[in-house]
């Protein structure tokens, strides 16, 4: 009987397929058009995945800023970024996996004559905000990068644009986007907006208030990028920050969070790395852990678990650490649904505190914003308002008595507040110069102020690579970016 079934099955299938054989003339290998909103959400996910990831093949920043250490493999913790091709992976993720999709999404949506003009304007502005965000990551990672010639398939050898010029254009684009976002119209539907929409409710056509939240997100990005310029163009920084302040994130309810789900392949990259991948590599860094312990920081138990003896112990960055002897990240940090924070109230309040210290016109006092930022961080991770009040009452935490001038006070607390946002932590350490971290054991270089350019660029785009390397002062990790003057 089984043999007869095997013989009969092809006959049945052939009969079923003979009703319409014209479809076999279709170009089955030609990709079908992907909707613009889907490309947008895919690009945003690729950015988020890269920024949250803990894989040493993708994201090394937790070790660079000494939030985490490694148990066994020390290459990346020791600033060896070339063995695994980290610069290439970072470059590819931003250009190919994010910016290329965002550009195509913009093209498709622009050409859609059926789309309501107001919705189209909002969608294009939101896409551009994310393009600015991604290009900002590239500039802050490498310095001069392809910009005007980037993403042009007809030009395989793009020139590199001056980083400061790129930054100025990004700031202009961001200001234009803020002017175009119109709260009278919807933006992306809920199934495509994984930051402010509900990713599960795919039947919805829109979510009230999402455009307002994108306005706040874009304004915080404007503040953040503006402040990066403070040491090299204080006038431009002041204008950007003061313009954005009233529009920027004003509470935790405005936080821009990429929402991961509990099922594969949509769960958090940290969950994928640590739980699914069963990695026993990642441990607390002694540098951060010692500070959390010394200051009785309520985030200690929210950031990390104990070692096998029930104690909180950090591992030495760059040195082999016995996994059972040191603390590991707390389970909430790598939960399947742990979100990635694109921008939040914590960061925005630290920016406002800094703005007051720089003499910019923003409401409130530096101390108020500093306190708000720390409180928001403790609450975000699951602490209480009472925990925050007790912590802020400590002389080594209180703004008026904490060690150092404002850069040190804000820089130190921002380093803690940007836990699980290590790329942004790397930017802030370079910008504010605090905390002043010691080099890891057996460091392969000085502190990395940038990534070197990818090997592919050196080999395939050699002339433009050589010009770019000379323009920034040499393709070395120690070379400072244009905004890093101190």
Residue ranges and their predicted role:
Residues 17, 204, 272-296, 300-304, ...:
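Long, intrinsically disordered, low-complexity segments
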Residues 377-379, 388-395:
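C-terminal beta-barrel architecture of Gram-negative outer-membrane proteins
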Residues 54, 61-62, 150, 188, ...:
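Residue-level signal for alpha-helical context at structural boundaries
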């Amino acid at each position: 009987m089984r043999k007869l079934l095997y013989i009969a099955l092809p006959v049945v299938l052939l009969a079923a397929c003979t009703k319409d054989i014209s479809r076999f003339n279709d170009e089955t290998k030609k990709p079908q058009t992907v909707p613009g909103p889907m490309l947008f959400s895919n690009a945003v996910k690729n950015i988020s995945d890269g920024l949250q990831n803990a894989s040493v093949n993708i994201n090394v920043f937790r070790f660079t800023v000494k939030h985490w250490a490694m148990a066994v493999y020390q290459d990346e913790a020791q600033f060896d970024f070339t063995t695994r091709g980290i610069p290439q992976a970072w470059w590819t993720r931003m250009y190919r996996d994010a910016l290329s999709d965002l550009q195509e999404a913009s093209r498709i949506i622009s050409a859609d004559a059926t789309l309501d003009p107001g919705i189209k304007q909002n969608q294009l502005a939101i896409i551009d905000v994310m393009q600015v965000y991604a290009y900002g990551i590239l500039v802050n990672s490498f310095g001069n990068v392809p910009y005007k010639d980037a993403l042009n398939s007809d030009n395989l050898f793009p020139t590199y644009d001056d980083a400061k010029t790129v930054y100025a254009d990004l700031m202009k684009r961001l200001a234009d986007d803020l002017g175009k976002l119109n709260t009278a119209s919807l933006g992306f539907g809920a199934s495509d907006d994984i930051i402010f929409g509900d990713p599960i409710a795919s039947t919805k056509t829109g979510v009230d208030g999402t455009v307002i939240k994108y306005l706040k997100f874009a304004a915080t990005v404007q503040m953040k990028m503006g402040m990066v310029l403070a040491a090299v163009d204080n006038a431009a920084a002041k204008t950007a920050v003061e313009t954005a302040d009233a529009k920027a994130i004003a509470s935790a309810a405005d936080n821009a969070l990429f929402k991961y789900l509990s099922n594969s392949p949509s769960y958090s990259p940290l969950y994928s790395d640590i739980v699914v991948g069963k990695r026993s590599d990642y441990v607390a860094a002694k540098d951060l852990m010692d500070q959390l312990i010394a200051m009785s920081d309520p985030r200690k138990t929210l950031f990390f678990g104990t070692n096998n003896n029930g104690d909180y112990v950090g591992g030495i960055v760059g040195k082999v650490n016995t996994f059972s002897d040191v603390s590991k990240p707390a389970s909430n940090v790598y939960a399947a649904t742990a979100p990635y924070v694109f921008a939040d109230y914590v960061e925005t309040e630290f920016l406002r505190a800094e703005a007051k210290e720089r003499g910019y016109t923003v409401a409130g006092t530096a101390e108020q914003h500093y306190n708000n930022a720390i409180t928001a961080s403790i609450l975000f991770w699951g602490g209480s308002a009472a925990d925050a009040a007790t912590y802020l009452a400590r002389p080594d935490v209180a703004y008026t008595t904490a060690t150092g001038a404002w850069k040190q006070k804000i820089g130190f607390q921002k380093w803690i507040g940007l836990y699980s946002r290590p790329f942004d932590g790397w930017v802030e350490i370079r910008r504010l110069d605090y905390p002043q971290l010691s080099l890891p054991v057996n460091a392969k270089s000085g502190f990395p102020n940038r990534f070197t350019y990818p090997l592919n660029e050196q080999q395939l785009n050699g002339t433009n690579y050589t010009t770019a390397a000379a323009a920034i002062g040499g393709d070395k990790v120690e070379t400072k970016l244009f905004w890093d003057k101190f």
